[in-house]
Amino acid sequence: MDSPTTQRPNMEIGRAFVNYHPSIWGEHFIAASPDVMRLDAHKGRGEELKEVVRNMFSTVNDPLLKMNLIDAIQRLGVAYHFEMEIDKALGQMYDDHINGKDDGFDLQTLALQFRLLRQQGYNVSSGVFAKFKDDEGNFSSILSKDTHGLLSLYEAAFLGTHGDDILDEAITFTTVHLKSTLPHVSAPLTKLVELALEIPLHRRMERLQTRFYISIYEEDRERNDVLLEFSKLEFLRLQSLHQRELRDISLWWKEMDLLAKLPFTRDRVLEGYFWTVGVYFEPHYSRARMIMTKMIAFATVMDDTYDVYGTLEELELLTATIERWNRGDMDQLPDYMKVIFIALLDGVDATEDDLTGEGKSYRIYYLKEAVKDLAKAYLAEARWVSSGYVPTSEEYMKVALISAVYPMLFVAFLIGMDEVVTKEVLEWAIHMPTMLRTCSIVARLMDDIPSNKLEQERKHVSSSVECYMKEHGTSYHESIQKLREMVASGWKDINKECLKPTPVPTAVINVILNFTRVLEIIYQHRDGYTDASVETKEHIASLFVDPIPL
């Protein structure tokens, strides 16, 4: 693959420039074609298996077996086929819990029930785990020998909210004992423990979890072979759909030809699509994925313009032009910014045309407002850089909540969804609801932690790390630890917002939840969007390139 300097024209002398690596994938997804004939041959088999799985909800009566069935269905990525059945089963399970029918459950069963119910929005008390403590108020040492129970409690504990102190204790207790027992357990339990200790299930991107779990479940002697076969066929079917979407988005990006005109920006459109699959991978969210992917591409161009290439004077002009949103009012912009503005307007106009036929053109107003807010936040940071100002943590977060891009991307995804998104939902979304605010804080902090040292090697807006260090007089490592604690606290806030009753439909709430899950993957080891050459490359290959053997 050519280097960036041979692929792109020389930059204007005196301009800032970051040598981002070129696209990992190039035109791979334009040239690749899904094996449609193979998929068609299995279509009938998939429908047959789906109905067999559906019947299991009425034939499986044992509480633990039904919990294991629901857990496996969710982990294997096929739960969207059985939403009504799962909702009914968990509703009955909650009623049984209220009536004390779970008093005799062991640790593994009770923790699994707690996790499934909290995931469904039921506010089950964490006090149910008190019976596993000894007379001194600590978790009983006998539990250390129950690896399945420890893992079940560990996974459940990450659905805690503020005040669930016993779940904080459970995380500490189970982490210590799972690490110590890991060398002594065998597959597939070993792999489940390793994955959990890396990123707990509740915080893991669902589609990647499915890819991992299919391989793990295949090794489970107690697996349900019908469910396993169905999940494999479904994975391949959706992989084919995602490949077609990647082809369409790659062709769109190629036709835009922005890299030739704006060589300073990152080429990460496929990584942006990966992000959207982490939000919702199901077929009926296809349009939302496409809209959000395009808006990620535009946001990346804007970010690199404000952060790296543009002068402050130019950025002031661009921001004012975006605020006016008038195609005939851009003469004052330098040529390269005209390219940006026209591309942005063309993209939003195309989305509006698509929505107009369904009577949903009113949604575009909210997207435009979100883009304007993003531009203003980027400009505020550019002004800080220009003046050398280090803001307070409060000043920084007020702007960074918007520049983290999530408020705009949230709206972008919503406008592509079905009738569950109403004008009232969009009004709620545009006014920074608590859950979105928390997600944006977590996003900014998780971005700043791995990106900090790299970005500070050049002139860049002070990150939350620098702001915290200056304001509190702490060391770098102390500040990083504090930010990690803030991320953990943010997750508790998010968990609380997911409990019933929610202010908007669960499908909308889950967009924010899944956004936050993607962050755990993208920023686990580095800024995996900017440097997409390692883990992100592997993740994309596992979801969209490598097939699962039947």
UniProtKB/Swiss-Prot annotation:
Statement: the UniProt record of this protein carries the keyword Chaperone: no
Span of the signal peptide: none
Chain positions recorded as Mg(2+) 1 binding sites: D303, D307
Reactions catalysed, as given in the entry: (2E,6E)-farnesyl diphosphate = beta-cubebene + diphosphate
UniProt GO MF annotations: magnesium ion binding; sesquiterpene synthase activity
pH profile: Optimum pH is 7.5.
Annotated pathway: Secondary metabolite biosynthesis; terpenoid biosynthesis
Names of the cofactor(s): Mg(2+)
Tissue: Expressed in young developing leaves and in stamens. Not detected in tepals and carpels.
Temperature notes for this entry: Optimum temperature is 24-26 degrees Celsius.
CC cofactor note: Binds 3 Mg(2+) ions per subunit.
Keywords: Lyase, Magnesium, Metal-binding
Residues annotated for Mg(2+) 3 binding in this entry: D447, E455
One GO BP: diterpenoid biosynthetic process
Short motif DDXXD motif, span: 303-307
Chain residues that bind Mg(2+) 2: D303, D307
Record-listed E.C. numbers: 4.2.3.128
UniProt KW RNA-binding keyword: no
Domain remark in the UniProt entry: The Asp-Asp-Xaa-Xaa-Asp/Glu (DDXXD/E) motif is important for the catalytic activity, presumably through binding to Mg(2+).
Function: Sesquiterpene synthase converting farnesyl diphosphate into beta-cubebene (24.5%), alpha-muurolene (19.3%), delta-cadinol (18.6%), delta-elemene (16.0%), tau-muurolene (10.8%), and beta-elemene (10.8%). No activity with geranyl diphosphate or geranylgeranyl diphosphate.
Family: Belongs to the terpene synthase family. Tpsa subfamily.
Protein name: Beta-cubebene synthase
Organism: Magnolia grandiflora (Southern magnolia)
